[in-house]
Amino acid sequence: TWTVVEAKLAETWSPEQISGHFKANGQAGVSHEAIYQRIYADKRRGGTLHRTLRCQKTRKKRYGARERRGTIPNQVSIEQRPAIVDARTRFGDWEGDTVIGAAHQQALVTLNERTSRYCLIAHVPAKTAQAVSDAVISLLTPFADCVHTLTTDNGKEFAQHERIARTLGADFFFAHPYASWERGANENMNGLIRQFFPKKCRFDSITQKDIAHAMDRLNHRPRKCLGFKTPHEVFMTQLHLRHNSVALQT
């Protein structure tokens, strides 16, 4: 059992995720408290298991959080977003944002589906509206029939929201300024992404392999809010249900 636990820690699973995954799959496991005790005992012996734990620092505002001069034309407020999006009962409602590299150079576009917490990540050479809209469209086009809405903050990088909405056949909404809690899942995801790409990381050195690795790790971690299923499991199940439903209607 401990061999499995240590393997999952190496995959950046938290002790609670490991314990919950054991229980959810009917396997004999250990409590998350016992895992923490083993980690700290290992640290006292000079071990390195503690390095697998996520850093619990006080959240700071993201760089550029207040670079919101001017108004994006034709914005649609989150206040007009259907209530079903808040309920998280419909598959295909997405949140989006950007994560900035060191010295504000280059960025990552991050998207997550609200019901499954499934995330998509793309690197952009600059945080321009053109580059960001290209990335969003590229990421979501394979799932275009499962994109009902997209909600972002008021960053100017989302100025081409009408192009994104038109291309994907989706509705685009903007959260209130400085109200990150209105996109809580995406904000949380960005914090997890920083585990792989810290604030001091220069994004010009990031490869597609690095991004694929981060997405794989994040989408294959069991989540307590998903009954300790992984985002990948929930997303793929919903995707298959959607496609089967469409097939039956044709």
Give residue ranges: language-model regions.
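Secondary-structure boundary/capping micro-motif
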Residues: 1-177, 181-185, 190-202, 216, ...
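Conserved active-site loop/cleft motifs that coordinate metal ions or position small ligands
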Residues: 204-205, 226-229
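Catalytic phosphate/metal-binding cores of nucleic-acid and nucleotide-processing enzymes, i.e., regions
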Residues: 210
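Charge-patterned, long linear interaction tracts outside catalytic cores
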Residues: 230-250
